[in-house]
Amino acid sequence: MKRLSFFLMAAALLWGAYSALAGPMDGLLSDMGLSGKGAGDDSRIAAGLKEALSVGTKNAVDAVSRTDGYFANQAIKIVVPDKIQNVANVLSKLGYREQVDAFVLSMNRAAEKAAPQAASFFVDAFQNMTFEDARKIFEGGDTSATEFFKSKTQDKLYGAFKPIVSSSMDEVGVTKTYKEMVGKYTSAVPFASVESLDLDHYVTTKALDGLFYVLGQEEKKIRTDPAARVTDLLKDVFGK
């Protein structure tokens, strides 16, 4: 009889402990995005978005890093900076269009050469995506994952990417063609001045803008085109 009383008392204590903890634990799990049915959904969505970004990043980097990846794509082509557009216009009228074209081509070649290095800087944003981030992105617009990605990586990516772009610019002769172009201008237009320009900053910024633009296009494809969902996970998450 004493043993039965002991078990009944233990059961009562355990039930009381469960009742006391049930509310707070449910709240904690909910805050973590892990409660009930939504936990599996959120983890699946997060995994799908990470995979979409992974696939999209690879496709975007492949697209822009090939020859003419920037130069032949009018949406992301790096053109003459606004600060020296007047210089380019004057030179073109004076018969030096070839020098202007060479300068534009060299900037785009530098971006194409540097682009493959960008992929290695994207891993952190994949790993740090929370379930809450994933849910908002999934329910957002056609490029919401890209915008999230950009907000999380752009500053860090710029700092890491700029030296690579600068090195590429030296290799393809951007600075050389720029100086030649400015030299032609100052010779043709006596006493003319040319506004100072940070070419490294300009090309790096434009190269990243172009990369994120193409990544956004890849995200749109995955969201809207079944043929772009190249894995079972992408088909599962975005096919519903």
Regions found by a protein language model. Give the residues of each.
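Hydrophobic alpha-helical segments involved in membrane association or supramolecular assembly
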Residues: A47, E51-D62, D101, K113-P116, ...
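Sec/Tat signal peptide C-region and signal peptidase I cleavage site
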Residues: W15-A22
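N-terminal Sec/ER secretory leader and immediately downstream segment
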Residues: P24-S106
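Residue-level signature of catalytic and energy-coupling elements of molecular machines
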Residues: A60, T130, P226
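Bacterial N-terminal signal peptides that target proteins for export
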Residues: M1-L8, Y18
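An amphipathic alpha-helical core segment
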Residues: I164-K206
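Mid-length scaffold segments of soluble, non-membrane domains
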Residues: Y96-S168
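A cross-kingdom marker for long, charged
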Residues: G27-G33, D200, A207-K240
